[in-house]
A protein has these predicted regions:
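A glycine-/small-polar-enriched, mobile loop at the entrance of the PLP active site in fold-type I
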Residues: 17-73
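General beta-strand structural signal in soluble alpha/beta enzymes
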Residues: 20-22, 70-73, 94, 117-118, ...
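Active-site C-terminal subdomain of aminotransferase-like
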Residues: 27-28, 203-288
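Conserved beta-loop-alpha segment that forms the PLP phosphate-binding cup at the N-terminus of a helix
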Residues: 66-93, 97, 101-105
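Active-site-proximal loop->helix
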Residues: 103-114
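Active-site phosphate-binding strand-loop segment of PLP-dependent enzymes
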Residues: 126-184
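Conserved active-site segment immediately N-terminal to the catalytic lysine
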Residues: 191-203
Length: 290
């Protein structure tokens, strides 16, 4: 059934908003916006189950994982808080080289979790050697490392694969990664890099409206969460895991944003992740040259 004319005019004139020359929110394609203009469905019924199950393979592919990918109606900061409140029962080492690395540290402090900042000059990456020195010099002190993969405030891409390998040298330490401006735009490998928690938001490299956060968690992360009573209610990692096989959300979702996610995941998979990463790299190089 065709959309009413006034609605169709609204969702097919994105050029009125101009081009967004900023990390996000990004320009959203008209067909993705149009996908949102559909009736709301009951989020505890078969319609929601079909919607989420239909995206399952694509979302796992996006994160390069066999683990389920959780979708939350929140900003990505919500899943940053999830990492802090669900994955540490001791002290946290936050890798800070920009505004969003600092945000991880601030969240830890606000949530009453002891945390230290391993800071580098803004515009420089954290090196594996620096992290190894920090962990080796403080044995048994830290149980969680947080890092931003693509630090939006500086443009630095941290070597997360190598940093995760350093963390894996320590049996009781987990690693949580902010991939907000990298997932969907640059290579991120949840399984191959042996990460414990990876999060992103809808409004950056996924080119969706703001309002959704996505994350994946390792078995190690879930085992850690089971030992922490005060995990948060809204951002309880175990509840996300419990709902995942049912293809249900933990709380009332923004259904129409899920429609947009479904439409955009179809576009991303049609393009192919490798091709999408290459396209982003080519655009970056053209911008740097200009």
């Amino acid at each position: 059934m065709p959309l009413p004319d006034p609605i169709r005019v609204i969702v097919t004139k994105p050029m009125e908003f101009g081009r967004f020359f900023l990390p996000g929110p990004t320009e959203v394609r008209p067909e993705v916006l149009e996908a949102m203009v559909r009736p709301v469905i009951g989020h505890r019924g078969e319609d929601m189950e079909r919607l989420l199950s239909g995206m399952d393979t694509a979302l796992r592919g996006l994160f390069r994982t066999r683990r389920p990918v959780y979708v939350s109606t929140s900003s990505a900061t919500g899943f940053m808080e999830t990492a802090i409140t669900n994955l540490s029962r001791g002290r946290i080492l936050c890798l800070v080289g920009g505004a969003f690395g600092a945000r991880f540290h601030k969240i830890a402090e606000r949530c009453g979790r002891p945390a230290d900042a391993l800071a580098v000059e803004w515009g420089t990456p954290h090196t594996p050697a620096l992290l190894r020195e920090a962990l080796d010099s403080s044995p048994g002190v830290y149980d969680l490392v947080t890092v931003v993969h693509s630090e939006t405030s500086t443009g630095v891409l941290n070597p997360v694969a190598e940093l995760a390998a350093v963390v894996r040298e320590h049996e009781d330490i987990l690693i949580a990664v902010d991939g907000v401006t990298s997932v969907g735009g640059a290579r991120v490998e949840f399984d191959a890099w042996d990460l414990d928690f990876l999060l992103t938001g809808s409004q950056k490299a996924l080119a969706l409206p703001p309002g959704l956060a996505l994350a994946a968690a390792s078995r190690r992360a879930l085992e850690r969460a089971e030992t922490i009573p005060a995990r948060s209610y809204y951002f309880d990692l175990l509840e996300f895991e419990r709902r995942a096989p049912e293809f249900q959300t933990t709380n009332t979702p923004a259904v129409n944003l899920f429609y947009a996610l479904d439409a955009q995941m179809e576009r991303i998979m049609q393009e192919g992740l490798e091709a999408r990463w290459a396209r982003h790299q080519a655009m970056a190089e053209r911008t740097w040259a200009w």
